[in-house]
Amino acid sequence: MSEERETVLITGASSGIGEALAWVFAEHGYDMILVARNAQKLDELADEVAAKHDVMVIVRPMDLSEPDSASNLARVLHREGERVDILVNNAGVLEHGAFIDIAPEDHQRMVQLNVAGFTNVLAHFVPDMVAREAGKVLNVASIGAFQPIPSLATYAATKAYVLSLSEALAEELRGSGVSVTALCPGVTQTHMVEEAQEQSEGVRKLPRMMIGDVETVAREAFRACMKGTPIVVPGTLNLAGTLAARATPKWLVRRLTGLMGRSTL
């Protein structure tokens, strides 16, 4: 990588918010290391980004739900002399539906990637940032992290973990030179949401105004990450809903999200 430019590592970079963030970071002159399972999409994205913005891009196809994947990634990058200045911890998977209708292996896959894989990436890259007294972390949670969501029960629970760990880590690292930002987007027009729309008539019927633009979300996330803002909720409606949920008794929030969740099944 270039000695003059900083490098961002983006997981889940082959589509959705991860891909959009790759374009935004490239616009601002960052070299990047892109990680995802789909090697073909990573290669295509890397070629397009490098050609348009004259940045250096490394691709590392891998499945971060595998227990040793984060350690293998860290070891390879260390051996190659690559420094990670900014970590975008975005890789995740979503399964929509009633809890009992989702296969046990799909619940496990969400926990393995959204919780275990997410944590392993942090554990292998944050210590080096702290040692250098410089770095930024952008963890991708969800607006679903703020309350339980029937029909997305396991997914929302994993994102609550992401938000909780992000907030705790932000405080632990206060004054260290390393900032931690939790991105909590609402429903965003990504491949993941498109799959949910295919599975659920209720999701398909969501008003267009409730579905965020992925590029807009990525730009808000970039700005918050640069500032070191602990939590960012893109979109006025999403932010208002989040603030309202935090001020509402939990039993009522559960009842309301239950009604909404059943309407999307």
Predicted regions and their residues:
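Conserved glycine-rich Rossmann-like NAD(P)H-binding loop of the short-chain dehydrogenase/reductase
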Residues: H28-L45
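C-terminal helical subdomain
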Residues: A182, R204-G241
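Conserved glycine-rich cofactor-binding loop
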Residues: S14-G16
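Active-site helix of classical SDR
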Residues: L122, T158
